[in-house]
Amino acid sequence: MAPDEGDQAMSLQEEKPAYPSLSTTSSAELLHGAPLNDNERLDILQTAEHAMHRGSPKVDPHIWTNVTSHFSDSSTIDGRQRDILFERLTVRGKGSPFQIQQTILSALLYPLAYPIKRLVKLVGKKESHDGPGTILRGLNGIVCSGELLLVLGRPGSGCSTFLKSLCGYLEGLDVDTASEIQYKGVPFTTMMEKYRGDVVYNQEANHHFPNLTVGQTLEFAAHARAPHNRAGNQRGDQCQWRGKKESQVSLALFSLGGERTEGKAMRTDTVGMNSIAETVLSRASIVAWDNSTRGLDAATAVDFVRALRTSAKLSGSCHALAVYQASETLYNTFDQLILLYEGREIYFGSRERAVPYFESMGWKRPPQQVSADFLTAITNPGERQPQVGMEHAVPRTSLEFEAYWKSSPEHAELQRSMQQYKQKTPLDISEEIKLDEVKRLEQSTHARPSSPYLLSVPMQIRLCIVRAWQRTRNDIPGLVSSAVAQIVVSLIIGSLFYNIPQTTAGLGQRGSVLFLAVLTNALISLLEINTLYSQRLIVEKQAAYAFVRPFTEAIAGVIVDFPVKLFRCALSAIIIYFLANLRREASHFFIYILFQLTAVMTMATMFRTLATVTRTIGQAMSLAGVIIICVAVYTGFTVPQFDMPPWFAWIRWVNPIFYAFEAIVANEFHGRHFECVEYIPSLSFQEGLSFTCSYVGSVPGERYVSGDAYIAGSYDYSYDHVWRNYGILVAFLVFFYVLYFWLTELIPGTTPTHEVLIFRRGDAHPKLSRSDLESGEQPRPLQELKSLAPPAHPSMAEQKDTLSWNGVCYDIPVKGGEKRLLDDVSGWVKPGSLTALMGVSGAGKTTLMNVLARRMTIGVVTGDMLVNGHEPDASFSRKTGYVQQQDLHVETCTIREALRFSAALRQPQSVSTEEKYKFVEEVIQLLGMEDFAEAVIGNPGDGLNTEQRKLLSIGVELAANPQLLIFLDEPTSGLDSRSSWAICKFMRKLADNGQPVLATIHQPSAVLFEQFDRLLFLAKGGKTVYFGDVGHQARTVLEYLEKNGARQCGPTENPAEYMLEVIGGGTQGQSTPIDWVHAWKNSSENTQVLEELDSLVSSPSNAIPADPCKLSEFAMPLAVQFHHVMKRDLQQYYRQPEYILAKFGAGIFCGLFIGFSFWSSDNSSQGFQNVLFSLFLLCTIFSTLVNQIMPKFLSRRALYELRERPAKTYSWTVFILCQILVELPWQTLLGICTWASFYFSVYGDDQSPQRQVLILLFTVQFFLFASTFAQFVIAAVPNLVLGSMMATFTFLLCLLFNGIMQPPSALPRFWIFMNRVSPLTYYVGGISATALHGRPIHCSNRELRVFDPPQGQTCGQYLAEYLKTAQGTLHNPLSSDRCQYCPLRVADQYLAARDISWHDRWRNFGVFSVYIIFNIIGAIGLYYLVRVLPYAMKNRTQKSPT
């Protein structure tokens, strides 16, 4: 708790009298005793808070729920109690039952195929359905307040859809019009519109702001839903104080700390508990929990459900939970139960009567099978077992089960109960009035009565402002890095135009520096898109919870960002303004800042609006690229208004930067006279009107140029437009604000995704075409008994190796010292044994597995880890299989391709490809994946579902045919009990075939636990509690615990839950009088373990083979690795048309837009300048290309470094080379397409083929440089934000110093070297010299310098001496007045001023090629130095002698 928060809390506590402590109050007293008053409950909160600050783990969840539920008078609670009645609930899904994988060819043919497809639909037979079909079919039931409903069913049966439907989360779903859902007399639509916060859905995915601590996250939730006008007329600050206390006790209840909510920085169980606590603090009357116990150990899951049970009884709330793995203890906590089978209801009623109902139907419950598993097994034809003699009497299909249910007495009783309930609580206004009264008591004073939110809009905005400020304050590194980047860019721009002279020599430089200042400040706002997309899911969730409206978060973001933007703008303005020597007048300086700030705010809001209306960040970035080009071209600087093509000239009127730039330029030049430094003619005798200044806006006979005349002649700007433009700019700002706020409320934040299987064209399995799906989920694997048949694997490698570890410790550096995660852990895994690794949450199970697999990249590992008594050799990693918790795969591959890739590169070279692929087919059959082996993996939420991904992860490791050991980290996490059982049986089969297996597991049932031979049990801190045999019915481990003082395990208890309980597991970490770590160290069992370890070392077996191929780090040579990896990468690109088409769309559009904007530039000086600026603008596509390439590289790098490199699948050189080379063909083709789209429109078709080909080569070079540069930058950096910042900064340097914006001769001496090292200098120089060499210049009327000759002389006579050395031409030598002089004769003179020469074109081509080669070498070198060498050194030094 922050100091200011603590002071506030103490001051509030001092106002209250001291009450007797109620910390000893029992749960029974709370449930059945006299009700507590508010003062007593406040005392409980304070006691719980003090216990939390003292580090006490004992915060009773029952006490906590009593206080949070009863912090008001009973009438308020009675009014908030809601029941749920659903009748004839039928829900259909949107979308296709399965999809066909798109490729580049199919995407290109789509415009032709779509009309044909529509025509066939019109004239052909109408399809039976347009979506994946009916998910839920006629469900009926009622859940009363105070009850818990357990939702059971196999994945794909409709459990998630059922929960979503109850809570009104209907994105992607259609509810049948005959369906009825009511909440104690309140209709469904009314409940969703007016009382949405009382009905919430806790989804399995967790989304939180990464820059908030857990405490801040929960405090926001508590404040958003804390009642603000309770009985007793308590003040608003006391309500806020209560919200703070509730959030603090939530931290203690769910064992959460002050760490950030970012998922990567926290364990899975911690993130899940954070979401659970947030949902509890929503104070909803009805909550649906979708597999929310995933990732929690058994004891913690039970504690969580018990807390919900207490909350339901005390507050009258009701909860529906879908649980895939429910222990008997957890099962007995529920009141009601619904069982779904293929979307049909086959039972609804009392939990106690569910098992007897199905037993009376004729089904047999196996011994030791928990009730939930038995009920779920009923819906699986391959698992359920009929009683003897009932084989032909029991129902078989879901239709038969539904018919049996509807004809049963239990269903008739349910119908009677529902009819009685509807008569008692009809759909009338009375219940709505009662609920309105309760809501008004809880709402703030100024909240709209019909609003589902408790806070008024101003209070929501204030709350969001506090949170936005917390996020900003917690992101100090981000703020500092962005400020440093802004300072550096400003310093570069300011020093590039350092001390611009107050003469005509600085006129062009002033325009350039103002253009760059406006453009860079405005385009930094592009990052707003990333910010908005990162918080979109969070804002959508909290709007569904009725915390705050989406537009209030948008307003808060704008308000909190304003001082940051003001600071950045002011900082940038001060640096650029004074370094460049712009107008030194206070009024003009502040006008400059005003327009800069307004332009930045306008562009930021424009990009936020763009992010709101798009569905993916790729779409937003593509459209943003279009906006950037339009903004840059049509400001009036690169293309003056009088040269704008009529078909695009209108763009400037809708371009906010056009108005800002005109005003800033006019502000700088208005009312100023710039002394001329170059005259025409430059003769010693000049008098009258016989000379003029050689700059736009000059007047014959005047020795200065008026600033107003200059901007009028150069840009067609006027000072009269300054404040008109500001009004228009503010109008743009207001318009985008209103549009942005409105769209955040109107448009949903996300498009629902469905786990629909994706197949390559022609590969869809026929069995899947008529599947009954939930959100596109396909029939589950492992559902037939044949999948459990004993496997026959003649090709399985013979296992003879033993992995042992002794005294393993692991320390990591933390602030202020080191933290020990593993402490003196010993054990072994022998061939043919299945070992379980268990422990409380955070005990170090995954850490130990990573240490044993030699996958740790930080910290110090000590102790012995040996294979057959020897140090592991270089082949150790590839000989082990490691199934991680994260299912990481290449999303475009099919299952069969992924398995073949693993087999081809990880099985020994001595095994032929045919044998490897044959083995893959055996793995597919063993895992029961035949029906979807050709399915594309896809991304999470779109493609394989959770179970299929887990099976694939196991299959990938099994396909490698590991010769040593298989590690499985939480292989059953997120799976239903049937799938978990099947996977454990599969591990058992592997062990029976001689394969040593080590697996972590956190929620095993008693039957599942018996599959393991040995157990390694860890306590908090990575300390050993037990290592040894499990025994029949776990008697060996139970006897050990009981003889050391644990209570006796009951005959129906789950041994896994029992063990967690007796050592102090669960959310509260219940204290135990027994020091189990000390007991183990002094036990005879530990002595036996150490003796066995000594024997394994003293009598090593299986000496290391001499064959060097068997000891090599990789199974296959580099050439074979390169072949398979390159083939996969090429396939990936071909199967991602959205990536390739976005790349080509950006390039072709950019080329066409620039081409038509600079259409057929004439031979005037302005025309040649337009040609150069067209190259400058074409370079802006560089940033878009780089930002497309880098995320793709990072995703592939993550897969390689997290899974494929530790497994020694292939070498790092193969990885980096393939990543570089796979881009080059597409970049080459993109360069050709871009050249064709802009070359002829800008340069015409009258140039020689040699010049056309050379410009084509330069264009292709540019795109090759862009891809290799992106990989050079991102190869070593840790994340996309840093990579994008570095790439943008480097590109900006190259762009600024390429000679277009500032000629080399005008650069400050310090920056001259940058012109020479900028790759774009050679690109621009090569193309412009090739395109413009030898072209004559014909000045336009605006560019001609007009003056009168002395009386009695013609223009030719007057300028005869001057023309001998001048570069220009005289148009009318015989005229005696108005001499017309063009300052330049040929384009080469124009280019020479920028140090560009025709003779250097091939040199430029060669130098630019060298930069491409440098990028490739640099990417390889940096990746090795930063990502490979430290990893290799860590692996070499990870093992230390004991």
Curated annotation (Swiss-Prot):
Entry-linked PROSITE patterns: ABC_TRANSPORTER_2
SUPFAM superfamilies: P-loop containing nucleoside triphosphate hydrolases
Annotated keywords: ATP-binding, Membrane, Nucleotide-binding, Repeat, Transmembrane, Transmembrane helix, Transport
Entry's Gene Ontology molecular function annotations: ABC-type transporter activity; ATP binding; ATP hydrolysis activity
Region (Disordered): 1-24, 768-797
SMART domains: AAA (SM00382)
Domain ABC transporter, chain residue ranges per copy: 120-367, 803-1045
Binding site for ATP: G839, V840, S841, G842, A843, G844, K845, T846
Origin: domain of life: Eukaryota
TM ranges: 476-496, 513-533, 558-578, 587-607, 620-640, 727-747, 1139-1159, 1171-1191, 1212-1232, 1254-1274, 1280-1300, 1405-1425
CDD domains on file: ABCG_PDR_domain2
Principal place of residence: membrane
Any GO CC annotation of this UniProt entry: membrane
Subcellular locations according to the entry: Membrane
Topology class, membrane: Multi-pass membrane protein
InterPro entries linked: AAA+_ATPase (IPR003593), ABC2_TM (IPR013525), ABC_transporter-like_ATP-bd (IPR003439), ABCG_dom (IPR043926), ABCG_PDR_2 (IPR034003), P-loop_NTPase (IPR027417), PDR_CDR_ABC (IPR010929)
Family: Belongs to the ABC transporter superfamily. ABCG family. PDR (TC 3.A.1.205) subfamily.
Function: ABC-type transporter; part of the gene cluster that mediates the biosynthesis of the meroterpenoid compound andrastin A, a promising antitumoral compound. Is required for the production of andrastin A but does not have a significant role in its secretion.
Protein name: ABC-type transporter adrC
Species assigned in the record: Penicillium rubens (strain ATCC 28089 / DSM 1075 / NRRL 1951 / Wisconsin 54-1255)
